[in-house]
Amino acid sequence: MSALHIQDAVKTYANGFPALRGVSFDVAEGEFFALLGPNGAGKTTLISAMAGLSRLTSGRIRVMGHDVEADAYAARMSLGVVPQELVFDPFFSVREALQFQSGYFGLKNNDDWIDEIITNLGLADKADTNTRNLSGGMKRRVMVAQALVHRPPVIVLDEPTAGVDVELRQSLWAFIQNLNRQGHTIILTTHYLEEAQSLCDRIAMMKQGVLVALDSTEHLLHAEKGLRVELLLEGALPDNLRAWQQPSNDDTVLLKLDDYEQLAFVLQTLKYAGVKVKHMQLTETDLEDVFVKIMRK
């Protein structure tokens, strides 16, 4: 059984805008999965449909085998969602907010788990502070805690580290990775592509409501493997190297190469042409390169 099953998901709004156009994929139990795409790709619309906040025009979504429409209660008990927008109740402390959230799911005597969440998310010294007095980063931590309060097997994180400082980001991911090791399925959307690259087993990419890529992180990176070489030259780039040249915003020359053999050829050619290399910066292809290339297709 898949933790998440999405089949032919279509969402068309009343004005005729097609937010989702036949999206289908599965996420396995225990997987750390990334759902990526530019603004307007349909990611949040899909997450809203998963959470039962909006209905699909057609198609089916199941969470841990439970249909989100036909078996809504069981599906929602199986899913925890951290929304993109900051949503909080300004009248309660952090602990009170989590206790009320437990009550929404019919959970009693949940204080031990609430304490564990509070500690692991770095909220211990803010537990009795009113949420309206918290910083934006702290409020986002509370939202993560609320999504976890009913111990859902599937956790959706929609831009969880937006506006969060580096130290918290590291502690948050350590906590989430520990939950994943315990068997929780994690579905992440983020514009920090380095996070998706380092954390996720598989990656799906959406564009204009359509799924345009779905593969393991390793395979996606391997398919677009290569080197970016940034050169500051004293002289002109030889003509036989211009096929590798990419657009650059400054005085540097940017080359896109396949491997280190091509790099050796470039340096040898520059040497024979009498072109001095004043500075060189080398980076290997990362997920951002793959993402940009796929989105441009």
Where are these regions (language model features)?
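Catalytic Walker B motif of ABC-type/P-loop ATPase nucleotide-binding domains
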Residues: 155-159
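ABC transporter nucleotide-binding domain
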Residues: 173-257
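Short, charged/small-residue-rich alpha-helical element at the C-terminal edge
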Residues: 226-297
